[in-house]
A protein has these predicted regions:
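Aromatic-lined substrate-binding rim segments of carbohydrate-active enzymes
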Residues: 69-76, 84-148, 270-278
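Bacterial N-terminal signal peptides
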Residues: 31-39
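Carbohydrate-binding surfaces of carbohydrate-active enzymes
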Residues: 280, 309-716
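The substrate-binding groove and active-site-proximal loops of carbohydrate-active enzymes
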Residues: 54-63, 88-103, 149-166, 193-197, ...
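Polysaccharide-binding and catalytic clefts of secreted carbohydrate-active enzymes
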Residues: 148-325, 329-332
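Short, acidic/polar
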Residues: 62-77, 296-308, 364-372, 487
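N-terminal carbohydrate-binding accessory modules
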Residues: 43-82, 95, 110-111, 429
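Aromatic- and acidic-residue-enriched carbohydrate-binding clefts of CAZyme catalytic domains
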Residues: 49-53, 86, 93-98, 103, ...
Length: 716
């Protein structure tokens, strides 16, 4: 992909020339050959990290008055040892076409280096300058809502050749300028990249080429996607319609997959450029974000995180969450587990998280510490706040930073000072925490897209991530460590318990692989609407749930919306907890044992939840949307049967515990109190040391946690 992007770029650079003249332009040809060689022989390499990074995003460009030296001193007092700069300021770096001004970058690099603070440089390509749009208005993406207007960030078409020409140029200019600066430790590719819904004529043309390459003939496309319906059949490639108006959910899902591929290619293209310049001791990362619901909630629908992360040396994420009485730590844990899983259970960077944020996010005393160390407990090697100082103008004025608008020390800044001190002091014990999970959640962007098109029905807001989070949160509350895998993962078979929510769209090969997982001794939990359609979101012509019925020992052909339906079975739950909603499948068991039937005068003969012994393993199937209490019970049962219920499961939310092995080979246990009530528990492990206090801890010692408090205990 790097090679293809390089060739495309140079073709664009030389498009005014004939082919003969192109090869006469020796300097361009040499550059092309050089980059092709670099693309072929340079790969992502995980960086060696020797200390915890504690940082902020810093914008000298936004400052209302001169205070750089004072900021550096306040950062040093706070224990800040890294800043990220430049990712939002293309119009400052290149105020006019081809005119570059590195004043702010140089000022910050010099000041930070003098202060002993490292710098991550972001490529400034997610917010385009005015002169570019004036010169090339077609850079603004056309979406199903029409052409974007200038003003907002992320309003451009990332596949536009003119945009990529300028992006390539500004990245190279910055890299040439900063690559040898000793303060620079790494580079961030773009910022929270997505396709931004780009779907204009040039994107549609690229999609047609993609479809030609993948499906070869229109007959194949018409058959696979069912385009005879409503006279959608395409009989000539020239007649291929825009996807903006399609009513075919299968074709829409394919276009969504193509748009995600644009993101993967775009990030790989930027990473390849940076890799030409960066030093061996510098890394490449990116700040992936998540489905946004006023905070970081679920799997990002618009990016294939695992695919896009392949071009990076280390994964990075932005994690924002509720605070005060709504702080649970679940979003910190979820985002961290996804990030750690992106690069095969490798440590990651939290590139953005909140210090204060919106008014409702101002943390209670103790919560900032709880949050920072919760990131480390999931495997983070860096925690970086956005931003350092609250901004005085424009869209994010009240997305407050570590400093408020007056730039003065405040309770959050004072608490951050204690974090910085502890990060520096405990870095040898806490950095590079290695985590091992026996439970994983299989997520699928293809299933997410398919379910978006063919979900629960009109007017139902419950989506893919709602169901996934119900299972994840259940594991989190029970202190069960969890990884994430996707269909491309080679490690699926390494787990003892695999949770597969809403696998609506999947190829036969994946479903057969999941059956083998069970047959070979794994315990799988499938949910409703799994196995329903193939990878092209075409509903299978067999009994549902398709191929997995073999391992699950069930089948069904009817489903409906539950009205006043509960579960009937030995669940040990209250009547309210046994209520179901939104969706129910009318399941007939073949070899499966029924765990719960529907409690209903008509549907009562059908199974709702089943369990089947298949080969050496167990397949649980949940045919309806249940309460969290039911989900938790099923999860706990699976974990116990897999032999994974241990000391940590004697504790539950609001006491959250996480553990891992540090670089000294010692096990570290984190204990967090996510509540405003004092609580206590009995420490179950052998002689240890509490790292924050330095106190010794012996087995069966009573540990007290104050509100929003924590302990970090290293086993001797």
């Amino acid at each position: 992909m790097c090679v293809k992007n390089t060739i495309n770029l140079y073709i664009h650079l030389l498009k005014p020339f004939s082919l003969r003249k192109l090869f006469m332009k020796k300097k361009y040809l040499l550059l092309l050959l050089l980059q092709l060689c670099l693309c072929g022989h340079t790969f992502a390499q995980y960086p060696k990290m020797t200390k915890l990074l504690y940082g902020v995003a810093y914008y000298d460009e936004y400052m209302p008055y001169e205070r750089l030296d004072k900021d550096v001193q306040m950062m040093k007092d706070c224990g800040i040892n890294v800043v990220r700069i430049a990712e939002s300021t293309w119009s400052t770096v290149e105020p006019q076409d081809g005119i570059f001004d590195f004043t702010h970058i140089d000022r910050v690099l010099n000041a930070m280096h003098k202060g002993g603070i490292s710098v991550i440089i972001g490529t400034p390509t997610y917010a385009v300058p005015t002169w570019m749009v004036k010169k090339h208005p077609e850079i603004l993406a056309i979406t199903p809502s029409g052409q974007n207007q200038y003003g907002a960030r992320q309003n451009m078409d990332i596949s536009n050749v003119d945009f990529k020409f300028y992006a390539n140029r500004v990245i190279r200019k910055i890299m040439e300028h900063v690559k040898d600066n000793p303060a620079v430790i790494g580079y961030q590719v773009d910022n929270e990249t997505k396709s931004y819904g780009t779907s204009g004529p040039n994107v549609q043309a690229l999609f047609v080429k993609y479809m030609q390459a993948k499906y070869k003939t229109l007959d194949n496309i018409n058959k696979i996607f069912g385009l005879d319906y409503w006279s959608n059949r395409i009989n000539n490639w020239a007649d291929f319609p825009s996807m903006n108006g399609t009513i075919n959910g299968s074709l829409a899902a394919e276009f969504a997959k193509f748009q995600r591929q644009l993101v993967t290619d775009y990030m790989a293209w930027q990473a390849a450029i940076i890799r030409e310049y960066k030093r061996p001791d510098q890394f490449i990362t990116h700040n992936f974000d998540f489905e946004w619901r006023g905070y970081s909630f679920g799997i990002q629908p618009d990016v294939d995180h695992f695919a896009a992360a392949k071009a990076l040396d280390i994964a990075g994420v932005d994690i924002y969450h509720s605070s005060q009485d709504k702080l649970t730590g679940a979003e910190i844990s979820f985002g961290g587990d996804v990030a750690r899983s992106m690069k095969g259970n490798k440590n990651y960077l939290v590139i953005e998280t909140e210090a204060q944020g919106f008014p409702q996010w101002t943390p209670y005393p103790g919560q900032l510490r709880l949050q920072a160390f919760s990131h480390l407990a999931s495997g983070a090697n860096m925690v970086e706040y956005w931003p350092w100082h609250s901004i005085h103008n424009s869209a994010e004025t009240y997305w407050k930073g570590l400093l408020s608008h007056d730039f003065e020390p405040n309770p959050v800044y004072d608490e951050a000072k204690t974090i910085g001190k502890d990060f520096a002091r405990l870095s040898p014990q806490l950095i590079n925490l290695k985590k091992k999970s026996d439970v994983a959640i299989l997520f699928s962007n293809e299933a997410l897209s398919g379910f978006k098109a063919f979900g629960f029905g009109w007017g139902v807001r419950t989506g893919y991530n709602d169901v996934l989070r119900q299972f994840y949160d259940g594991l989190y509350h029970m202190n069960i460590s969890c990884d994430f895998v996707d269909p491309s993962s080679s490690s699926i078979e390494n787990y003892k318990v695999l949770i597969v929510p809403l696998l609506y769209a999947a190829p036969d090969s994946l479903l057969q692989r999941l059956n083998r997982f069970v047959k070979n001794g794994g315990h799988i939990i499938h949910t409703f609407k799994s196995g329903f359609s193939d990878e092209n979101v075409k509903v299978r012509t067999t009994h549902q749930p398709g191929i997995i019925e073999e391992a699950c020992g069930i089948y069904y052909s009817q489903f409906t919306v539950p009205e006043n339906v509960s579960l009937k079975g030995d669940l040990g739950l209250s009547a309210a907890d046994k209520k179901i909603n939104t969706w129910m499948e009318l399941i007939t068991p073949t070899t499966a044992k029924v765990l719960a039937y529907y409690d209903h005068p008509v549907w009562g003969k059908y199974a709702a939840i089943t369990e089947n012994n298949y080969g050496k393993g167990i397949a649980t199937y949940i045919g309806c949307l249940t309460t969290s209490a039911v989900t938790d019970k099923i999860l706990a049962d699976a974990v116990k049967k897999a032999g994974l219920w241990n000391e940590d499961q004697q504790l539950s939310f609001p006491i959250i515990t996480k553990s891992g092995v540090n670089q000294k080979g010692k096990t570290v246990h984190y204990y967090f109190n996510y509540s405003d009530q004092q609580t206590s528990f009995t420490y179950p492990y052998n002689n240890s040391k509490e790292l924050l206090s330095g106190n010794s801890v012996s087995k069966n010692t009573a540990i007290t946690l104050m509100p929003w408090d924590m302990k970090i205990i290293e086993v001797d």
